[in-house]
Structures are given as structure tokens and as C-alpha cells.
């Protein structure tokens, strides 16, 4: 069975987790074997959306219903996600990369290091310029940080320059990028990080 790298994608509701995964998969699926696990509180809506998008065959997507605490399912008790990983591997024994999308949660949510090898945390500009200054653990500890919906900055009075400065304060040299996933702006930086950092380091 192929070694499988697992990347967790977390962030608040509506930040763009699902869209980011869909865009990445669309770019990478032709060159590698990929699966996706979605976490929703009471439904499997994200699983249905991803299946309907056609970016992956249905047998490469599994939806997990987490119940009331989505962060518990990716950290304190990740048993449902571990089971989903095993099921994806049984269905596709060549699988190289699995994305695990967390349910929408607060800035403190982080993935268990036993569940994922790397993590991406995404917020959006519409949540306010101050969000990076709050320094939540999801933003601080993630391997890659994404600030999405840059096109909304003028409408919410947010300075991207200030957000970048604040991000550098709490992340230091850890990578981050701005994106507008509607136009794919910034997507290349995320793909480059996966191809050059995740796979080189994860398979070392």
C-alpha cells in the first residue's frame, strides 16, 4: 500500500475551506492519487457538493458527521476520521494524498498531529482586518496559512498590508499567502507549497 500524506484544512465557517480543497484537487488529481474526507456537524453536505463537482470519483470522497463539536473530531477524539482514512485506503490502495476538511470552527481549532502530517488554516478578509491579531492556535500552529477573499478588502475597510504585517508577527517565517479563490489568485502559492514542501518533506 502506498504511503499516504494527510493534510488537514481548517478554518471558520464560510472562509473557503471547501473551495480551496476543490481547487487544489482539480489541479493535482491528474498527476497523483487523491482522496478527501469532509467533516460536517449534522449533515454530509460538503461531501455531496464535492461529489457533484466531479473533481474526484465518488469512491474517493467520504463525509463524516461529527456531531456538536467539530474540533473534537479532528483532535481529542479523531476516531471517525481515522476510520474514514482506513476506508479510503481500502477503496483505493494507491492513494497518495488525503485532504481532511474540518467542520467550520473557531480560531483555536487545530488538528491532532496523529491525524494529519501537515495542516492549512484559512480565514477570509470579510471577518475583519483584526483577525490575524487575535492569534488563534489554528493560525499560529498551521503549516500554511491562507487569507482568502482579498477582493472584499475595500468593502470591509481591511488593509491587506496590515493583515500581512500582523501575520508575520505571530507566524514569523512560516509560510502564508493571500487568495481570491474565485479567480484563483494565490492558488499557485498553495500548490507550490504542497508540491515542493509537503511531498519532499513528507516522503523524506
Curated annotation (Swiss-Prot):
Domain of life: Bacteria
GO cellular component, one term: cytoplasm
UniProt feature coiled coil, ranges: none
Main location: cytoplasm
HAMAP family per UniProt: UreG
Similarity comment: Belongs to the SIMIBI class G3E GTPase family. UreG subfamily.
Its biological purpose: Facilitates the functional incorporation of the urease nickel metallocenter. This process requires GTP hydrolysis, probably effectuated by UreG.
NCBIfam families found in the cross-reference section: ureG (TIGR00101)
Entry protein name: Urease accessory protein UreG
Gene: ureG
Amino acid at each position: 500500500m502506498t504511503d499516504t500524506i494527510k493534510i488537514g484544512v481548517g478554518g471558520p465557517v464560510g472562509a473557503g475551506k471547501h473551495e480551496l480543497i476543490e481547487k487544489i484537487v482539480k489541479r493535482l488529481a491528474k498527476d497523483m492519487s487523491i482522496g478527501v474526507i469532509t467533516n460536517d456537524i449534522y449533515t454530509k453536505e460538503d461531501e455531496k457538493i464535492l461529489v457533484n463537482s466531479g473533481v474526484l470519483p465518488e469512491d474517493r470522497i467520504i463525509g463524516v458527521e461529527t456531531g456538536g463539536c467539530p474540533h473534537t473530531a479532528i483532535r481529542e477524539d479523531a476516531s471517525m476520521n481515522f476510520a474514514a482514512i482506513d476506508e479510503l485506503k481500502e477503496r483505493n490502495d494507491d492513494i497518495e494524498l488525503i485532504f481532511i476538511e474540518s467542520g467550520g470552527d473557531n480560531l483555536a481549532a487545530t488538528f491532532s498531529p496523529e491525524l494529519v502530517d501537515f495542516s492549512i488554516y484559512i480565514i477570509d478578509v470579510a471577518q475583519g482586518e483584526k483577525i490575524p491579531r487575535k492569534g488563534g492556535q489554528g493560525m499560529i500552529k498551521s503549516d500554511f496559512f491562507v487569507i482568502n477573499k482579498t477582493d472584499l478588502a475595500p468593502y470591509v475597510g481591511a488593509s491587506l498590508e496590515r493583515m500581512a504585517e500582523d501575520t508575520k508577527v505571530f507566524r514569523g517565517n512560516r509560510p502564508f499567502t493571500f487568495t481570491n479563490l474565485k479567480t484563483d489568485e494565490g492558488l499557485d502559492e498553495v500548490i507550490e507549497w504542497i508540491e515542493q514542501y509537503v511531498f519532499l518533506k513528507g516522503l523524506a
